C-alpha cells in the first residue's frame, strides 16, 4: 500500500468516485465550480455523457453553482484545466499532417467552414426554440458547431481510426449535445458540446480502434495504470515493476500483470523484419500444427515399408486391412461395412482380418516395421 493519503494523492491516482467527491467538497467550500474544471478533472475517466449530466445534476442538488466563466478558476488550477479549456481554432479547417483525405472530405471541410458561428445570444435564442420543439433550430445549432467537431477530432488522429470516422463519431456526440443542452444552467453550448463530442470519439476509439475490443471500463483501468506507470518512471528514473505499480494502485501484482497483458496491441504477422524488408514476422513463427521434416520423412518411410509388407498378403487380405484401418483415406470401416463391399458376412471379414494380422505378426514381416514402433 502507498503511504499517500487519499486527500494528497494526485488526481491521476484517484478513482472516479474519489474525484467526484473531491469536486463536491471543493464546490461546497467555494459555492461554485466551473464546467471546465469538472470536465478536466473527470477527463481521465471514461464517463459517458449521460453520466456527466447526472453528475452535474448532483452538483446542482448539492447547492453548488456550475459556472462557464473561466475567471472563476483559481490561479493554481490553470494547468489542470488548460487542455480541456484551451480555445479551439474554429477557423482552421485544414487537414492534420500525415492525414490523407479524398475530395468529398475536403469539400465537406470547405463547406462547414462557410457556416457562420453563433454568438452567445444566438445560442440562447436557438436553445429556447429547441425547447419549444423547433426542429429547424436543432439543425442550425448543430450546423454552426460542426467546426468544433473537426477541431476536436484532429486531436485524436493516429489513435487507430480514420480522420473521417473520428468526425462522424464526433458529429453523433454533437447531435446528442443538441438534444440535451439546457441553456438555463448558464454555460455556453460549445463548452457543453465539447464533452459530448470528446466522449463519443473516445468511446468509438475504445470500441473500434483495436483489433481485439477492450470493454470501456477496462480502457479506463488501462489509462489509469499508464498514468501511474509514467509517474513512477519519473520518480524512479526507470521502468516500474508490476509490484511497484500494484502498490501504488492498491492492486494485486497478478491483476497488474493481467491489465498489462490486455493493454498489449496485436502485432501483424506481415511486420517487416530486417533492413531489406524482404522477410516478415510470420516467417519466423513456428507452425505448431505442421509436421516436422523429420516426422514427415519417417512417415514416408513407414508407408513404403507398410506397402512392402502388405504386398506379401493375398489381395483380399490386403484390401480388408486397408478398409478396416483406413490406410488409403483415413476412414476406418466396421466389419459389416467391409462385408457389404465383399458380399460376405461380418464374421467372414473378422476371420480374414484375424488371419492377415497373424501373418503380419510373423517375425519375417514384423521386423521390417519394428524400428518404426520404437
UniProtKB/Swiss-Prot annotation:
UniProt key word Lipid metabolism:
no
Please list the GO biological process terms of this entry. DNA-templated transcription initiation
| Sigma-70 factor domain-2 as annotated region, ranges | 141-211
Q: Which InterPro entries does this one have?
A: RNA_pol_sigma-70_dom (IPR014284), RNA_pol_sigma70 (IPR000943), RNA_pol_sigma70_r1_2 (IPR009042), RNA_pol_sigma70_r2 (IPR007627), RNA_pol_sigma70_r3 (IPR007624), RNA_pol_sigma70_r4 (IPR007630), RNA_pol_sigma_70_r1_1 (IPR007127), RNA_pol_sigma_70_r1_1_sf (IPR042189)
* Function of the molecule: Sigma factors are initiation factors that promote the attachment of RNA polymerase to specific initiation sites and are then released. This sigma factor is the primary sigma factor during exponential growth.
* Family, as annotated: Belongs to the sigma-70 factor family. RpoD/SigA subfamily.
| NCBIfam families in the cross-refs | PRK09210.1, RpoD_Cterm, sigma70-ECF
Q: What is this protein called?
A: RNA polymerase sigma factor SigA
Q: Per the UniProt entry, what species is this protein from, by scientific name? A: Listeria innocua serovar 6a (strain ATCC BAA-680 / CLIP 11262)
Amino acid at each position: 500500500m502507498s503511504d499517500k493519503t487519499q486527500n494528497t494523492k494526485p488526481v491521476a491516482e484517484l478513482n472516479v468516485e474519489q474525484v467526484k467527491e473531491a469536486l463536491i467538497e471543493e464546490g461546497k467550500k467555494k459555492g461554485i465550480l466551473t464546467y471546465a474544471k469538472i470536465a478536466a478533472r473527470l477527463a481521465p475517466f471514461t464517463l459517458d455523457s449521460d453520466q456527466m449530466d447526472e453528475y452535474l445534476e448532483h452538483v446542482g442538488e448539492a447547492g453548488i453553482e456550475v459556472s462557464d466563466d473561466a475567471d472563476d478558476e483559481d490561479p493554481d488550477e490553470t494547468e489542470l484545466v488548460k487542455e480541456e479549456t484551451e480555445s479551439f481554432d474554429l477557423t482552421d479547417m485544414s487537414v492534420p499532417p500525415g492525414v490523407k483525405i479524398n475530395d468529398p472530405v475536403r469539400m465537406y471541410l470547405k463547406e462547414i467552414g462557410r457556416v457562420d458561428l453563433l454568438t452567445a445570444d444566438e445560442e440562447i435564442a436557438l436553445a429556447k426554440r429547441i425547447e419549444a420543439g423547433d426542429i429547424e433550430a436543432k439543425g442550425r445549432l448543430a450546423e454552426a458547431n460542426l467546426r468544433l467537431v473537426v477541431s476536436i477530432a484532429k486531436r485524436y488522429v493516429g489513435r487507430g481510426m480514420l480522420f473521417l470516422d473520428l468526425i462522424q463519431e464526433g458529429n453523433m456526440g454533437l447531435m446528442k449535445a443538441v438534444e440535451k443542452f439546457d441553456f438555463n444552467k448558464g454555460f455556453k453550448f460549445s463548452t457543453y458540446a465539447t464533452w459530448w463530442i470528446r466522449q463519443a470519439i473516445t468511446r468509438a476509439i475504445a470500441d473500434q480502434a483495436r483489433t481485439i475490443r477492450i470493454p470501456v471500463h477496462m480502457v479506463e483501468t488501462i489509462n489509469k495504470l499508464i498514468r501511474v506507470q509514467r509517474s513512477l518512471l519519473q520518480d524512479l528514473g526507470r521502468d516500474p515493476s508490476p509490484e511497484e505499480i500494484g502498490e501504488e494502485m492498491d492492486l494485486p501484482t497478478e491483476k497488474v500483470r493481467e491489465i498489462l497483458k490486455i493493454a498489449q496491441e496485436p502485432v501483424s504477422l506481415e511486420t517487416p523484419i530486417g533492413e531489406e524488408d524482404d522477410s516478415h514476422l510470420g516467417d519466423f513463427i513456428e507452425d505448431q500444427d505442421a509436421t516436422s521434416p523429420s516426422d514427415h520423412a519417417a512417415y514416408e518411410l513407414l508407408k513404403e515399408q507398410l506397402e512392402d509388407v502388405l504386398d506379401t498378403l493375398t489381395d483380399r487380405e490386403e484390401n480388408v486391412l486397408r478398409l478396416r484401418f483406413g490406410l488409403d483415406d483415413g476412414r476406418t470401416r466396421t466389419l459389416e461395412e467391409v462385408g457389404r463391399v465383399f458380399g460376405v458376412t461380418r464374421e467372414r471379414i473378422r476371420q480374414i482380418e484375424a488371419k492377415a494380422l497373424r501373418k503380419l505378426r510373423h517375425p519375417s514381416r514384423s521386423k521390417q516395421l519394428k524400428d518404426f514402433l520404437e
